[in-house]
Design a protein with these regions (language model features):
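Short helix/turn-capping signatures at newly exposed starts of structured segments
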Residues: 1-121, 131-133, 140-175
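Minor-groove-contacting beta-hairpin "wing" of winged helix-turn-helix DNA-binding domains
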Residues: 125-127
Length: 175
């Protein structure tokens, strides 16, 4: 198992937005093979025993990114853009907060013409793009989490919320 660094580590904002744009601008629906190709084009390595798992620069051997699929169509992707620290310290907390703010500002700046709506939840911001792709960035106690949701999953989640089937805010707070 890869040992966690004492300090929080994250991609610089230019690398972060390169990853976000690649996923946001990709055509949808996306097959699992296309997702693997996209991950690998961004420098992530496929995890041979489980093709839906991927390894970022932050991990030597352990998968830290993944896709979910249904009928060979990608539903969402969790993309590692940081490596969690092993302890919560004031320095790590400040660095995580600053990085999260920088990432949010970069999305707002670089994707401003693509954003249809945004929703701020506790320690989370969700941007829905005009193409239906959903970007969720979450500030956690030891790292930052990036999820990309396919247009199909974005539509399903919105329909569930409109029918009041679940409260995603409460679920996300537990992450």
């Amino acid at each position: 198992m890869t040992q966690r660094p004492a300090r929080f580590e994250a991609y610089p904002t230019d690398r972060f937005i390169e990853i976000v744009k690649a996923w946001a601008n990709h055509h949808w629906p996306m097959t699992s093979a296309e997702a693997q190709e996209l991950y690998e084009s961004l420098g992530y390595r496929a995890y041979a025993p489980k093709p839906e798992l991927f390894i970022s620069d932050f991990s030597q051997t352990d998968p830290d990114s993944y896709i979910t699929t249904h009928s060979d169509r990608v539903g969402d992707a969790r993309i590692s853009v940081s490596h969690p620290c092993n302890t919560v310290t004031p320095q790590n907390t400040d660095t995580i907060s600053c990085t999260f703010s920088d990432y949010c500002a970069t999305i707002e700046d670089k994707l401003k013409d693509m954003i249809a709506r945004r929703k701020r939840e506790r320690n989370t911001i969700r941007w829905t793009l005009h193409n239906g792709v959903d970007i969720r960035l979450a500030k956690l106690s030891k790292n930052i989490s990036l999820f990309i949701e396919s247009p199909r999953m974005t539509k399903l989640r919105r329909e569930e919320q409109e029918m009041d089937l679940t409260s995603y805010g409460e679920i996300l707070e537990d992450d």
